[in-house]
Structures are given as C-alpha cells and as structure tokens.
C-alpha cells in the first residue's frame, strides 16, 4: 500500500464545482464578516490613506471584490489554480495570482497598505512561515481571521486536513490558539497587535452552551492604531516550567524533609 503524498501540487484538484465557498453555511458566515469589514475598512482607508490591498487566501474572490468596491486597488492570491480561475471569471477587475502563502518568495509581491487574510492560517502546515510573509507584505495594517483552538497559551494542534480539495494545499494543518497567533505576530516583527472589541455577528465568534468560541479576528501593524474598535493585545508569556508536575513545590519539600530524616545523627562530644 502506497503512502499518500503530504502535499498536493498547486493546481491539483479532485473536487468538481460547486465550490465550498458557495455553500449556504458559508454564505451566512460570509455575510456576517462582510458587515464587520464594512465597519472596519472604510474608516481605516480614510484615516490611514490606504490605496492598495492584498487578499491572501482569496478563494473565489468574495472578499477581494468587497475590498475593490471599497475603493482599494486589490491583488488577490490563492494556492489553488482552480480557485483563481473561478475568481478571475467572477471578478475581472481584480489582479488574481496563484501563489503559496508559505513560500518565502511571496514577499516579492511588494507591500500593501492593507493585507487581508481571512480563513487561511489554520489550513497551513507552517503558519509561522505565513505570518512572517504577512509581515513582509504589510505596509500599514494586517487584518487576519482564523479558526482557533480553545487554549489561552500559545499552543498549536497538528490536524489532518479533510478531503475538501479547494481549501488547502497540504494534508496536514496547524490549528493555533489565539495566543499562538498573537505570539507569532509579535515575533514576526509587528510592533502593535490588537483584538477587536466586537467580532462578526455570527455564532462562530461567540461562545454558546456546550461550545467555546471557534474563530477570532486580529489586527497587527507597525503603526500604533487609534480606534474604538480595538484593544491592545499583549504578547503572551508562558510562566513556569511546562514539564514541572509539582507547581506548588510540595513534593520537593517532602523529598528534602525525608532526606533529612535519613541522615545519620551525629552525637555531641562530651
């Protein structure tokens, strides 16, 4: 039995249309994100004098078109050629290109006032490489949305990717915690990282009975952003020793006490 490949060639597809991006469940979540973005992008475009945008992991171009309609000159990138071909047919005014988010040569695209990366990071095998690329591409602000695991510390979980062929390039993906995203952003070189006070109005962005919040949106920049929408997010710090099974120190104290009891007593000289 042959072992399956760990990487799908760019452009390889086993899935006919319709695209996952067009499914009804995707539509509901996308509309919530669109409403959220209208509140965010328009003020930034004016206040920060944004003219250009990069949509990394653009799929079939829904958000690329929204950014274009907001008055930005948009370049959009996806790793799967069938997504790009479909996007070009739907939105001919956008510059769509095929590229891998984990490829260091991606920085050759230049810098963009707004870098937009929604729903991509957790599909990647090496998300930190992608975050480094995002930093190199960001001229003013990075706006990133991702699924997150329910952990506060900067942890990642390696998972098998499902058989959805228009979503990722590899069979292995890394799901980060929100803390991991913040940590990667700071270590990639962003001076300022922010959480949003209000998330998109969709169940994935809020906890419910029997379920924790699934997704988050983070902003990062070399500039200090002043906005009522944002709260500063500090770089997470791991405290203590992860390998320590005695955080209170009680076991070590007992060991020292037992050691003292075992020592032979010395008699005082007369």
Model feature map: region roles:
Residues 1-112, 160, 212-269:
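Conserved N-terminal segment of class I S-adenosyl-L-methionine
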């Amino acid at each position: 039995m042959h072992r399956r490949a760990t990487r799908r060639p760019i452009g390889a597809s086993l899935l006919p249309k319709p695209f996952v991006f067009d499914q009804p469940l995707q539509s509901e979540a996308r509309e919530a994100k669109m409403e959220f973005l209208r509140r965010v992008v328009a003020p930034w475009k004016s206040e920060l004098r944004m003219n250009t945008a990069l949509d990394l992991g653009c799929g079939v171009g829904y958000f690329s078109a929204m950014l274009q309609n907001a008055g930005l000159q948009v370049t959009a990138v996806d790793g799967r050629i069938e997504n790009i071909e479909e996007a070009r047919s739907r939105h001919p005014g956008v510059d769509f290109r095929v590229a891998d988010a984990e490829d260091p040569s991606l920085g050759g695209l230049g810098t963009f006032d707004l870098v937009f990366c929604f729903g991509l990071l957790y599909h990647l095998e090496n998300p930190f490489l992608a975050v480094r690329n995002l930093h190199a591409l960001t001229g003013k602000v990075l706006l990133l949305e991702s699924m997150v695991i329910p952990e506060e510390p900067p942890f990642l979980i390696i998972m098998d990717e499902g058989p959805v062929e228009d979503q990722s390039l590899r069979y292995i993906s890394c799901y980060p915690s929100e803390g991991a995203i913040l940590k990667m952003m700071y270590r990639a070189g962003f001076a300022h990282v922010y959480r949003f006070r209000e998330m998109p109005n969709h169940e994935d962005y809020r906890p419910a009975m029997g379920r924790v919040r699934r997704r988050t949106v983070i902003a990062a920049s070399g500039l200090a952003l002043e906005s009522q929408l944002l709260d500063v997010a500090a770089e997470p710090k791991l405290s203590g020793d992860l390998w320590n099974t005695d955080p209170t120190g009680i076991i070590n104290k007992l060991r020292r006490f037992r050691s003292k009891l075992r020592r032979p007593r010395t008699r005082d000289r007369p």
